């Protein structure tokens, strides 16, 4: 992957000229894929649980969800997450609130702090389109605003959405797209999911897919493979 400072030597969105040196600061935000999509709420068991993510590139993540109010039909939860670089340094710290409906619909509002880089506020929603004993289909969307520590770099928005399908809680697939207008950048991803193990208190999934970022500032964009494991534990 190219460093953004090597690619963006003529950045001038809306008559704003940014010094090339500032792109070193933007590189983790533009390239770090884990921060594109915020934590979403959807159809899950309504009890305290956490998940650990281990990616093939060495990055990892930890998420927790704590229900604190609700009834048999609606639930509110506190959510938090940590993302780690391949060197096991904290890349992002996230906290927020989530709402879930028994029909599989959900909303979330999160605040993410990226140490040494900046902050991101995101709102996300999930809409269940179809559900029965064998099939589940969700649509999701999000909007996020990122503000960097360097005041010379303008804040920017990212919006996106996608579809997720699951068959018998065993095999699934998803597609998504995210758009950052300030950099004329579009991110595409397609993933597959296979459940390897599940019991009453835990599950282990394998995920793999392809992702691609397209921008005038990325001259040789190509599809890149992604893979990882997700372990989830209910308490």
List where the protein language model places each region.
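Outer membrane beta-barrel transmembrane domains
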Residues: 149-153, 159-164, 168-219
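Transmembrane beta-strands of outer-membrane beta-barrel pores
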Residues: 54-58, 80-86, 101-103, 111-115, ...
